[in-house]
């Protein structure tokens, strides 16, 4: 609930109806610490993912294209995280100027949409590869994957435009601090409603439903195949992996989406209780830490579903350089069914079972 006051020296001066909301000493210590941890772990992990996929795996599969772009999107966001750490440590005083305020804010929004869209495409690709491997072969090409990623980056950039346009540096007169924040000229504006609903629906609900549907259909197809093979342990493993993927996405983002919706209600003046505003403003940076920390782990999480990725990742940690030239045959194992003959029965007499792997 922020009301416009005046403009001076190019910086708008405003009043905050709840000046103490979210301003707690433990937040100013805990959140910068968590941001620093996310920055170090995220930069290290995602950089290794980029190196493994591009230099070791040679970017030969559709899913590897999505994983590479996922890691790159995370790195773009992580580069701005130190700014937010300093901002929070300085008790929400923005010292970096208006341009960095816009760029850093747009980076957060860009990462949200790019990551969610890429994970959604990855789930669709996995569904097509496992449930319809033959029918989808002509559609699931490297060219299609790269064009899809370009479109995703453009859409994420478009979704980030409101942050560039409406996020600015403001001077709050009744607290005497300069903040980097959204500010709406009128509480009757439909803009916060539109942005909030876009974030809730396009940035979470629709992608989650697609991811849930894709992996449910994958599990049913694999369950049927393993029942024919009477391979119950393998079936249980696949179920656990799929459940982990779906729940990992859901619980990473649902807290942030809920408090984003509540924040919109506060901005519109529908919620006027400063106690509720304090809860929302206190919880928001915590939910951001949960969402974006898990987001930055996604490339590693998905990558480690594949044996080749794990193999090359461990080689990289041991400083074993990639081979100058790959002699492996053209493989689509990362995004198609792989088959393993039974140890006890000849492959000519027993149909092999499909394998859910990311390689």
Curated annotation (Swiss-Prot):
Q: Which GO terms describe its molecular function?
A: angiotensin type I receptor activity; angiotensin type II receptor activity
Instruction: Give the PROSITE patterns listed for this entry.
Output: G_PROTEIN_RECEP_F1_1, G_PROTEIN_RECEP_F1_2
* Amino acids binding angiotensin II: 15, 17, 167, 182-184, 199
Renumbered to this chain, the positions carrying a covalent lipid of the kind S-palmitoyl cysteine are 355
**Where, per UniProt, does this protein localize?**
Cell membrane
In its UniProt entry, the species of origin is given as: Pan troglodytes (Chimpanzee)
List compositional bias (Polar residues) regions by residue number.
335-350
* Glycosylation sites (chain numbering): 4, 176, 188
Disulfide bond residue pairs: 18-274, 101-180
Which InterPro entries does the record associate with it?
ATII_AT1_rcpt, ATII_rcpt, CCR1-9-like, GPCR_Rhodpsn, GPCR_Rhodpsn_7TM
Transmembrane stretches in the record are 26-55, 62-89, 99-125, 142-165, 191-216, 240-268, 279-304
| UniProt function note | Receptor for angiotensin II, a vasoconstricting peptide, which acts as a key regulator of blood pressure and sodium retention by the kidney. The activated receptor in turn couples to G-alpha proteins G(q) (GNAQ, GNA11, GNA14 or GNA15) and thus activates phospholipase C and increases the cytosolic Ca(2+) concentrations, which in turn triggers cellular responses such as stimulation of protein kinase C.
Q: Where is this region: Disordered?
A: 335-359
Per the annotation, which location comes first and is thus the protein's main one?
membrane
GO cellular component terms attached to this protein's record: plasma membrane
Q: Which residues lie on this side of the membrane: Extracellular?
A: 1-25, 90-98, 166-190, 269-278
Give the Cytoplasmic compartment stretches of this protein: 56-61, 126-141, 217-239, 305-359
| Name of the protein in its database record | Type-1 angiotensin II receptor
Q: Does the keyword Cell division apply?
A: no
Recorded family membership: Belongs to the G-protein coupled receptor 1 family.
Classification via Gene3D superfamilies: Rhodopsin 7-helix transmembrane proteins
Which Pfam families is this protein grouped with? 7tm_1 (PF00001)
Give a short account of its post-translational modification. Answer: C-terminal Ser or Thr residues may be phosphorylated.
Complex and partners: Interacts with MAS1. Interacts with ARRB1. Interacts with FLNA (via filamin repeat 21); increases PKA-mediated phosphorylation of FLNA.
Membrane topology per the entry is: Multi-pass membrane protein
Biological processes, Gene Ontology terms:
G protein-coupled receptor signaling pathway; inflammatory response; maintenance of blood vessel diameter homeostasis by renin-angiotensin; positive regulation of cytosolic calcium ion concentration; regulation of vasoconstriction
Q: Which UniProt keywords apply?
A: Cell membrane, Disulfide bond, G-protein coupled receptor, Glycoprotein, Lipoprotein, Membrane, Palmitate, Phosphoprotein, Receptor, Transducer, Transmembrane, Transmembrane helix
């Amino acid at each position: 609930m922020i009301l416009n006051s005046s403009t001076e020296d190019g910086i708008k001066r405003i009043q905050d109806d709840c000046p103490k909301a979210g301003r707690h000493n433990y937040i100013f210590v805990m959140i910068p610490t968590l941001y620093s941890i996310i920055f170090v772990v995220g930069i290290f992990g995602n950089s290794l993912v980029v190196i493994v996929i591009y230099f070791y795996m040679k970017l030969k599969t559709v899913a590897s294209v999505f994983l590479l772009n996922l890691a790159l999107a995370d790195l773009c966001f992580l580069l701005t995280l130190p700014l937010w750490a300093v901002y929070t440590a300085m008790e929400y005083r923005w010292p970096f100027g208006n341009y960095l305020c816009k760029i850093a804010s747009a980076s957060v929004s860009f990462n949200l949409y790019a990551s969610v869209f890429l994970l959604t495409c990855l789930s669709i690709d996995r569904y097509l590869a496992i449930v319809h491997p033959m029918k989808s072969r002509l559609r699931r090409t490297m060219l299609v994957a790269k064009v899809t990623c370009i479109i995703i980056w453009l859409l994420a950039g478009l979704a980030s435009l409101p942050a560039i346009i409406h996020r600015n540096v403001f001077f709050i007169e009744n607290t005497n601090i300069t903040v980097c924040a959204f500010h709406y000229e009128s509480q009757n504006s439909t803009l916060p409603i539109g942005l909030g609903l876009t974030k809730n629906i396009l940035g979470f609900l629709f992608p989650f439903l697609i991811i849930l549907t894709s992996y449910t259909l994958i599990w049913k197809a694999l369950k049927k195949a393993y029942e024919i093979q009477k391979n119950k342990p393998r079936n249980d493993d696949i179920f656990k992996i799929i459940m982990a993927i779906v729940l990992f996405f859901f619980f990473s983002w649902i807290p942030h989406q809920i408090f984003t919706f509540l924040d919109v209600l506060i901005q519109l003046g529908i919620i006027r209780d400063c106690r509720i505003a304090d809860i929302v403003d206190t919880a928001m940076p915590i939910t951001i830490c949960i969402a974006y920390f898990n987001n930055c782990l996604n490339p590693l999480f998905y990558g480690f579903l594949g044996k080749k990725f794990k193999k090359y990742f461990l080689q990289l940690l041991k400083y074993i350089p990639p081979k100058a030239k790959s002699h492996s045959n053209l493989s689509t194992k990362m995004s198609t069914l792989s088959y393993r003959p039974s140890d006890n029965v000849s492959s000519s007499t027993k149909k092999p079972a499909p394998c859910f792997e990311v390689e």
